[in-house]
Amino acid sequence: RHEEYARLLKGHTTADQIVIIFSGCMASLIYKNVWGDDDTCPVFVESTIPPFSTRRVEPGKVRMFVRHLAPIAFFPASAADKYYDRIIADIYEFPGKFEDVLECGLSLVNPTVHPGPCLVNLSNIEKPDFTFFLYEHGFQPSGLKIDVLLNKERLRIGEAFGYKIHALEDFAGVDTIDSWEPMYAMGHGCHALTSIAGPNDINYRYLTEDIPIA
């Protein structure tokens, strides 16, 4: 999808424009590969999460559950010094910046939140007579233990690149995560999360995107 959109966008930008990609997952590298050395290549900015958690309620109506604030990364990384303050003033109050898009990509929180609870609840997700709520029904010890292991692997990868990743820890509001309890407490203690229904289909992004990325 990123490559398809980048090809549509190429030819309609200038070098002093900024393209912001929410939930970028290192999409800047894909965009740059499409532009190559073209002198119309804009500056790319990535965030780890979308600005809002939303769900479509009905045609033409969307419910917003929570507003997100997360740091951003620039590509090239050197553009941060020039453009960060401008983005804060003109667009959105992003609370800080990553060193580069690799650190940003490794800090995506969903790949260490959704996989475990989804994998151990596939039968409930597929039940036609049951509305599954991930943060209410899925945030149980068995699934969260998988997330803890995924996060430990992610932390080791980050350390190998010289990064101190703390995305899941920030999500849970703790300094370290050594067990499932902090995530359980955070999920069940946040109405903005427990009120989000789904997934109720195995072809949902929690499974088709977050699990492969993890």
Which residue ranges define each predicted feature?
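Internal, well-ordered alpha/beta segment that forms a basic, Gly-enriched binding/recognition surface
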Residues: G36-T40, E46-P95
